[in-house]
A protein has these predicted regions:
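ATP-dependent carboxylate-amine ligase
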Residues: 1-3, 11, 70-71, 147-333
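A transmembrane-helix-recognition feature enriched in membrane-embedded lipid enzymes
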Residues: 1-44
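Walker A (P-loop) phosphate-binding motif
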Residues: 30-97
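A secondary-structure boundary/capping signal
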Residues: 46-49, 138, 169, 287
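Rossmann-fold NAD(P)-dependent oxidoreductase module
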Residues: 63-67, 139, 245
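Phosphate/Mg2+-binding loops and adjacent switch elements
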Residues: 81-83, 87-206
Length: 333
């Protein structure tokens, strides 16, 4: 879905009109978060958002998976497979499955580590464990009570923050902020903006870690694209961040087109972009997540990979190691 503009401005007529509905939605969401869930039998680390849309969860999952492997763990991702038609549980096969089957994010992640898609998260736990998981990484699901979490890391974009701070549909929040803050174990702030500073101060005041991080583009791809004029397009939570990252890398963005998050590209849309790039002598560039939905055109579109780097990796490592130790201590008979 494409987020309405009033979600990211000062309180407006639109948001005020929707506040009664938001109050009802928020009350239901808060009550749902209080339910008990399945104990997975292995530590569960959840990477989530307070709000709808993207903020950098997928790069965070990849960074955590890398760290967990360094710690000697076998992480397996558990996802609902948003945008895919398979209810699961199913292990994602990057050769056999398409984004329309399992969702674009799980398909992209499956190129790096084992991923299980299950519309009902609890049903996916046995399959994740069957893949040898010593740790389950939940991609999203912070507000879901289906599986007991041993650590919840919340990702916030430092430029966007929490928008107008209202609960859906008056704003972007998935539930009232207070109960979400109480269930947060660590905050990951992506970028150098100030929009998340107030939330960071509240989390820090609770004695919980605030982890600063930034997206780092692939140096080889940046070198390849410098000197070229590009036509950039993206159907992610915040396409503007992608376009700005290209420009900050010294790449000339001669044209850009933004689509809604998880946009199901039509053949006509892609052929139109390819034709425009050809006419204007531009290189067509998109995100890795978008390219997962565009396999048939992968030879004509250049992906722009990014990784998440933490400013204080030792702090992240200590947090994760401590959480794993405590989780296993609780699960011992």
């Amino acid at each position: 879905m494409r987020e309405p503009r009033f979600w990211h401005g000062a309180p407006s007529v639109n948001s005020n009109l929707l506040r009664p509905l938001a109050a009802l939605y928020g009350a239901i969401a808060e009550r749902r978060m209080q339910r008990g869930g399945l104990d997975a039998g292995v530590p569960v680390i959840c990477v989530g958002n307070y709000h709808v849309g993207g903020a950098g969860k997928t790069p965070t999952v990849l960074a955590l998976a890398k760290l967990l492997r360094e710690l000697g763990e076998t992480p397996v991702v558990l996802s609902r497979g948003y945008g895919g038609k398979l209810a699961g549980p199913v292990k994602v096969d990057p050769v056999r499955h398409a984004a329309s089957d399992v969702g674009d994010e799980p398909l992209m992640l499956a190129g790096t580590l084992p991923v299980v898609v299950s519309r009902k998260r609890a049903d996916g736990v046995p399959l994740a464990r069957a893949q040898g998981a010593t740790v389950i990484l939940m991609d999203d699901g912070f507000q879901s009570p289906a599986v007991v979490k041993d650590a919840s890391l919340i990702v916030i974009d430092s430029e966007r923050g929490l928008g107008n701070g209202q609960v859906f549909p008056a704003g972007p929040l998935r539930a009232p902020l207070r109960p979400q803050l109480a269930r947060t174990d660590a905050l990951v702030i992506v970028g150098n903006g100030a929009a998340a500073d107030a939330v960071a101060a509240e989390i820090a005041a609770q004695g919980k870690p605030v982890l600063r991080a930034h997206l780092k583009p692939d140096e080889a791809q940046v070198a390849q694209l410098r000197g070229q004029r590009v036509l950039a397009f993206a159907g992610i939570g915040d396409p503007t961040r992608f376009f700005n990252t290209l420009r900050a890398s010294g790449i000339e963005v001669a044209g850009q087109r933004a689509f809604a998050d998880h946009h199901p590209y039509s053949q006509a849309e892609i052929e139109s972009l390819i034709a425009k790039a050809g006419r204007d002598g531009l290189t067509l560039v998109t995100t890795e997540k978008d390219l997962a939905r565009l396999r048939d055109w992968s030879q004509q579109i250049v992906p722009f990979p990014v990784t998440l780097e933490f400013d204080d990796p030792a702090l992240l490592r200590k947090f994760v190691a401590d959480r794993l130790f405590k989780a296993r201590a609780r699960k011992e008979p």
